[in-house]
Regions:
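Conserved N-terminal phosphate-binding loop of PLP-dependent enzymes in the Aspartate aminotransferase
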Residues: 1-140
Length: 140
């Protein structure tokens, strides 16, 4: 867990120097921290987010990058074909099983309230780790 104010400062520096803020959610994304994405715990507004395994819970190959409209506009190089730049940059492009698995995975996460369960289990884990740290000075 980053120190308090860390992400605010990172975001401030990026905005000040016109640097795009990329958040890699391959490990923390898609419900693994009690929110859809780990960065949501700190109110960060990234310019683009990458995610992979968790999108389909490992049942199908899928990875994706999600971005803002402003970043998307930067990549357009042909007004007649606004998707031209993005057409051939996908490892799993054209494979429908990944997106199908992702949609079903997200439906299950919502239907079974797994974000809430993750939050409860996370709080339980933290409480138990804190109890261990109190008993063993080498922890922490």
């Amino acid at each position: 867990v980053p120190p308090e104010g860390y992400w605010d400062r990172v975001q401030e520096i990026c905005r000040k120097h016109d640097i795009l803020l990329h958040i890699d959610e391959v490990v923390c994304g898609v419900g693994r921290t009690g929110t859809w994405f780990g960065y949501q715990h700190w109110g960060v507004k990234p310019d683009f987010v990458t995610m992979a395994k968790g999108v389909a819970s490992g049942y199908a190959a899928i990875a994706c990058t999600v971005t803002t409209e402003a970043v998307f506009e930067m990549f357009k190089d042909d007004a007649a074909d606004p998707m031209g730049y993005f057409r051939d940059i996908s490892t799993f492009g054209g494979c429908a099983s990944g997106p199908a698995a992702a949609l079903e995975n997200m439906r299950i996460i919502e239907d079974e309230a797994l974000l809430d369960n993750t939050s409860r289990m996370g709080a339980r884990l933290v409480a138990n780790l804190e109890a261990l740290a109190e008993r063993h000075r080498v922890i922490g």
